Amino acid sequence: RLAVDPERFPDDNQEVMATKGMGAVYTTTADGRALRHPVSPEERTRLLDTYFHPYAKAFEDVVARILDRHGRCVILDGHSFSSTPLPYELDQQTERPHICLGTDNFHTPELLVRSIQALCVAQGLRVEQNRPFAGTYVPLRYWRTDPRVRSVMMEIRRDLYMDERTGAETPGLPRMRE
């Protein structure tokens, strides 16, 4: 994600995070500092053509193969998040869940959300939907057009398994692996 974020819309006019310098082509860091010099339209096109579009095409191809073979595809979009809000984040509330489930009204069935929530709650984890992050990745070829493609984003709060300052694993890591 230092150069390009393949989970963003390639058109900054469609991508809310572009206002934070974190659209398809990143121009700022998580703490709001400049990541690079201003990106020219030509350089942006080169970055998208070199990294974004090949990734998107490869992901689309995998989804197409799964659909051909099974008739449906479930994407589990895995991420982690800081225990305290970072400057770029739209949600600055300090009380954060253990698990964030990002959903899309078209691609995330309620049964999938309820099932994941139940598994997490049974482990004593606090789960919120679309908070502090919202949405989930679906290749643009299928986005809001093909109901056979299901997707949910699952974000795990980092302090549950690592020391956020050093990156060292903590005793909570085995529990999160489970």
Predicted regions: what they are:
Residues R1-E178:
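N-terminal catalytic or cofactor-binding beta/alpha core of small enzyme domains
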